[in-house]
């Protein structure tokens, strides 16, 4: 099995600890005036999504996690599980709602998502960085009503709510940045 030394640690690296896959969120190299150097690392458990902090002595090695990031197409959900399909082999995978998390606000049927698999089980689903979604409900923008900064809430077809400019109307398709949950522009046809 592949291993990583502490000097190879960087954000996004996937490692195994205590039998669970973790991803490195933050890595800080510390060299005290006296004693051995060490790495203070923040890790996110990919199964539970909890963040833990751990220290590793400089030069220590850890096992690489056997996780795979793959592009899968979202099909449907039945309330408990979200079903994805591999577009090349047409093989389907069921991800629990806990693995989908906040991505549920942004994905609709037929969207392609990045899914992290461990032992062929989906652990985490990431929505595309930008999605085009239709506005299903928003207040009419009244001309001259800019005291609130010129934005209003709009409910999208997936159920998510974002702040949009006053000129946006119901039925329009918007481009949304899923990382910040922000309106970017009107979608181009």
Swiss-Prot record:
Q: Output the Pfam families linked to this UniProt entry.
A: EFP, EFP_N, Elong-fact-P_C
> Which SMART domains does its entry note?
EFP, Elong-fact-P_C
Keyword tags = Cytoplasm, Elongation factor, Hydroxylation, Protein biosynthesis
* GO CC annotation: cytoplasm
Chain positions found as N6-(3,6-diaminohexanoyl)-5-hydroxylysine = 34
Gene Ontology molecular functions? translation elongation factor activity
- GO BP term, example: peptide biosynthetic process
Compartment(s): Cytoplasm
Task: Name its pathway.
Answer: Protein biosynthesis; polypeptide chain elongation
Specify the domain of life of the species encoding this protein.
Bacteria
Among InterPro entries, the record links this protein to:
Elong-fact-P_C, NA-bd_OB-fold, Rib_uL2_dom2, Transl_elong_fac_P/YeiP, Transl_elong_KOW-like, Transl_elong_P/YeiP_cen, Transl_elong_P/YeiP_CS, Transl_elongation_fac_P
Q: Does the keyword Cytoplasm apply?
A: yes
Q: How is it modified after translation?
A: May be beta-lysylated on the epsilon-amino group of Lys-34 by the combined action of EpmA and EpmB, and then hydroxylated on the C5 position of the same residue by EpmC (if this protein is present). Lysylation is critical for the stimulatory effect of EF-P on peptide-bond formation. The lysylation moiety may extend toward the peptidyltransferase center and stabilize the terminal 3-CCA end of the tRNA. Hydroxylation of the C5 position on Lys-34 may allow additional potential stabilizing hydrogen-bond interactions with the P-tRNA.
Q: Does the keyword Protein biosynthesis apply?
A: yes
Q: What does this protein do?
A: Involved in peptide bond synthesis. Alleviates ribosome stalling that occurs when 3 or more consecutive Pro residues or the sequence PPG is present in a protein, possibly by augmenting the peptidyl transferase activity of the ribosome. Modification of Lys-34 is required for alleviation.
Q: Which HAMAP family match?
A: EF_P
Q: Which family does it belong to?
A: Belongs to the elongation factor P family.
What protein name does the entry list? Elongation factor P
Gene expressing this chain: efp
